[in-house]
């Protein structure tokens, strides 16, 4: 277990289930009770430090867009259901706002933009980044009813990308619970462990990008995926299987 924890500075956040998968990947079979006992004895079990809170303010003006997700965050193929939201991080030189887009199929963060403001352009640019990187045409893009997501600019970007917009019910954070779960993970595993209020925004941006695109997407055991495959690995596994079947 110590070897697993030493593989990455983020791995010391591993819980019992992810530790069991990590050991299995190394050919070591261990039961839940044994893992629990060893992790507890060594002080390796951690509880969340804080509870995440919503950030964007909902608007009731846009009523024609319905909730197409309905708390069903599962997807059988990549890029059919996408989730997005904004979170705020206090830094030495101001507040940093992060805007990711997650693919429900694998949990992969397919786009991430960060700025010192939470204006609609932040969300529009995140959507454009996802569209430039992957073929997401035809997907549902789900968010809360914050003014950024109900703005004409964002709705225009949704239409240009060939997406279908879905909005949470007013004041119902559970309608986007999986996205909120990502923010909680990011904060627990990274942001609450570093003094962001003493660090400049540009540095915090680099740390977040490195965590998301080199660890979270590519290395971190993701228990919702078969065999705990990391998000990017699960998507690539699916794509390889499709190529084999098409050959």
How does the language model describe each region?
Residues 1-77, 230-239:
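Basic, flexible linker segments flanking DNA-binding modules
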Residues 9-11, 25, 74, 91-92, ...:
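Conserved, non-catalytic sequence blocks in retroelement Pol enzymes and Pol-derived host proteins
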Residues 90, 94, 112-134:
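Active-site beta-loop-alpha junctions of metal-dependent nucleic acid enzymes
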Residues 91, 103-104:
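Short, acidic, Ser/Thr-enriched surface-loop or helix-capping motifs
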Residues 94-100:
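Short glycine-rich loop/turn motifs
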């Amino acid at each position: 277990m110590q070897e697993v924890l030493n593989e990455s500075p983020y791995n010391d956040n591993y819980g019992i289930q992810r530790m069991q998968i990590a050991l299995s990947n190394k050919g070591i079979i261990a039961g839940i009770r044994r893992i629990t006992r060893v992790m507890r004895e060594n002080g390796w079990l951690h509880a969340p430090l804080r509870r995440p809170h919503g950030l964007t303010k909902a608007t009731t003006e846009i009523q024609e867009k319905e909730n197409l997700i309905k708390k069903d965050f599962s997807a059988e193929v990549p890029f059919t259901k996408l989730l997005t939201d904004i979170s705020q991080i206090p830094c030495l030189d101001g507040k940093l706002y992060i805007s990711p887009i997650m693919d429900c199929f694998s949990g992969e963060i397919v786009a991430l933009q960060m700025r010192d403001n939470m204006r609609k352009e932040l969300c529009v640019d995140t959507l454009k980044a996802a569209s430039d990187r992957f073929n997401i045409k035809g997907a549902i893009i789900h968010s809360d009813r914050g003014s950024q997501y109900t703005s004409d600019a964002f709705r225009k970007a949704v239409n240009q990308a060939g997406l279908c917009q879905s909005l949470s019910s007013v004041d119902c954070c559970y309608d986007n619970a999986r996205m909120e779960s990502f923010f909680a993970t990011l904060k627990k595993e990274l942001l609450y462990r570093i003094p962001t209020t003493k660090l400049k925004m540009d540095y915090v941006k680099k740390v977040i990008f490195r965590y998301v695109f080199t660890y979270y997407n590519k290395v971190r055991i993701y228990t919702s995926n078969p065999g705990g495959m990391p998000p990017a690995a699960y998507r690539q596994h699916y794509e390889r299987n499709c190529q084999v079947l098409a050959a």
